[in-house]
Amino acid sequence: MGKEKFERTKPHVNIGTIGHIDHGKTTLTAAITKIASLKMGSKAVAYDEIDKAPEEKERGITIATAHVEYETTLRHYAHVDCPGHADYIKNMITGAAQMDGAIIVVAATDGPMPQTREHILLARQVGVPSIVVFLNKCDMVDDEELLELVELEVRELLSSYDFPGDDTPVIRGSALKALECDSADDDAAKPILELLDACDSYIPEPERDTDKPFLMPIEDVFSISGRGTVVTGRVERGIIKVGEQIEIVGIKDTMTTTCTGVEMFRKLLDQGQAGDNVGVLLRGVKRDDVERGQVLAAPKSITPHKKFKAEVYVLSKEEGGRHTPFFSGYRPQFYFRTTDITGIIGLEEGVEMVMPGDNATFIVELIHPVAMEQGLRFAIREGGRTVGAGVVSEILE
């Protein structure tokens, strides 16, 4: 049979493999593409193709990531796999590869290891909504009780980071054995099919961007004589319709106004939606009331904050970052959406300093409030040069 064309009718879900080094993430990724190709006729991707993942730049940070895709009867998946531990951390913090769910791979021969823990913690901090477990290398463990023990340990670990450990699907199998299958009906292929079923049923379908509350970061402000003030930007999520009330949030006190017009490419529209670059005409707003760095948002959907906790990756010297460590009290710029805002960094107790190439937890206090929520990404800059990337993990005030 020929290659099926890519059907857009199925819901699209972004997923990725996480877990400790050498526990079998890349082998599992290859096995999934192989079994899915045998069952659905999609393309199989070999281990070495995934392993030599090309390096990409995301906000100036070099990340090696492999992207594969496959289908189940219900969904289309885009799957990311990273060769190195540092790549995972950078990936999750920058949001370079958005994950709607993750498959955590744990070798039954080892049980949970330090990176297993770190990846689960990061998944929690950056807001990965759900995790499915693949217990790998089960063919190398003869003792059923040992498997039970490892499974229990993984469930407890998930629960300790506020994932529902007791309800999480745990699939046992061998990625390597599955990779050797010639048919999707082979016994060794069954765990992979079970895993895909678990992803289908357990990882929720992501909410479409257009269904979320409206938000547009303001890039520019113009005043048009006789018509009023227009702000331009790219709609990040939701839909804005002419006549709707909206808030202007961040930097200054929140203002409420009404959208009296939406235009795109100089044409008037009745609405703008996620992905559109638009100009929004605001009623009764003066040119000086609004500035770049604020956002337009659906009323009560987002609030301005100054103080937050964040997971941050600090660029290494090779990536063009700092050459020296920094300490509590460091004052760089935080680039949120469209603008830089100065903030002061506090390090966690017991952490003396942060070296280039490290990832760390920061407590940040900005000099102006910014419209923010958990999961918001930002860059840390010094004089226009990016020295770090982060994600808001908790709002403090």
Curated annotation (Swiss-Prot):
It catalyses: GTP + H2O = GDP + phosphate + H(+). GTP binds at residues 19-26, 81-85, 136-139. The keyword Ribonucleoprotein does not apply. Its main location: cytoplasm. It is an enzyme of class 3 (hydrolase). Residues 10-207 form the tr-type G domain. Residues 19-26 are annotated as: G1. Residues 136-139 are annotated as: G4. It is found in: Cytoplasm. CDD domains: EF_Tu, EFTU_II, EFTU_III. Its EC number is 3.6.5.3. Residues 81-84 are annotated as: G3. Mg(2+) binds at residue 26. GO terms for molecular function: GTP binding; GTPase activity; translation elongation factor activity. It holds the Pfam family GTP_EFTU_D3. Keywords: Cytoplasm, Elongation factor, GTP-binding, Hydrolase, Magnesium, Metal-binding, Nucleotide-binding, Protein biosynthesis. Residues 60-64 are annotated as: G2. Residues 174-176 are annotated as: G5. InterPro entries: EF-Tu_GTP-bd, EF-Tu_GTPase, EFTu-like_2, EFTU_2, G_TR_CS, P-loop_NTPase, Small_GTP-bd, T_Tr_GTP-bd_dom. Coiled coil: none annotated. One of its GO terms (cellular component) is cytosol. GTP hydrolase that promotes the GTP-dependent binding of aminoacyl-tRNA to the A-site of ribosomes during protein biosynthesis. Belongs to the TRAFAC class translation factor GTPase superfamily. Classic translation factor GTPase family. EF-Tu/EF-1A subfamily. HAMAP family: EF_Tu_B. This is Elongation factor Tu. It comes from Oleidesulfovibrio alaskensis (strain ATCC BAA-1058 / DSM 17464 / G20) (Desulfovibrio alaskensis).
